[in-house]
Amino acid sequence: MAYKTSLNYSPSFDSKKRKKNQIKFIIFHYTGMKSEKAAIKRLTDFKSEVSCNYLIKKNGDIVTMVPDLYISWHAGKSLWKKYQSLNKNSIGIEITNPGHRHGYNRFSNSQIRSLIKLSRSLIKKYKINLKNILGHSDIAPERKKDPGEKFPWEYLAKKNIGFW
């Protein structure tokens, strides 16, 4: 299933490329900002030192922020099984949502449709195990809540995105 993206590169990423076989995980996030505009501003501000590989906007548009073979700075201090600092082994997908601090909403149907298309493509391209599709809260539970309880994990699992 093909997906279309626009480009709005973030300056915050590791300049050294990784190998395709190093990508083992997909990590889902919500932006946690008051507005989509504020989220994009933060993700494209060098001083923020945060980024993601993809951003899915409220209307379902997918924006490439950091190309897949570059390491985006989305996971921070993180741990999953034998992996630490998951940035180097994962693709980070931010989904526009104000999050718990700013009136956490359901994710739009357009966002979920785009997330399914993008995730299926990444799973196939990088041979990602469905058990390695995680939320930020899974890999950093002491400090992160996203993508949160309104994230449709069960629905995505029925679409072969993740595990329920």
Model-derived segments and spans:
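Conserved, mostly hydrophobic/aromatic
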Residues: 28, 93, 115
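Conserved beta-strand segments that form the floor/walls of ligand-binding pockets within enzyme
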Residues: 55, 92-94, 134
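Structural preference for beta-strand elements that scaffold enzyme active sites
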Residues: 25, 90-92, 132
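Structured loop/turn residues at beta-strand edges in well-structured enzyme cores
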Residues: 21, 88, 128
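N-terminal catalytic cores of peptidoglycan-degrading enzymes
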Residues: 1-84
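Basic/polar, cationic surfaces and motifs that engage anionic cell-wall
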Residues: 4, 84, 98-99, 103-164
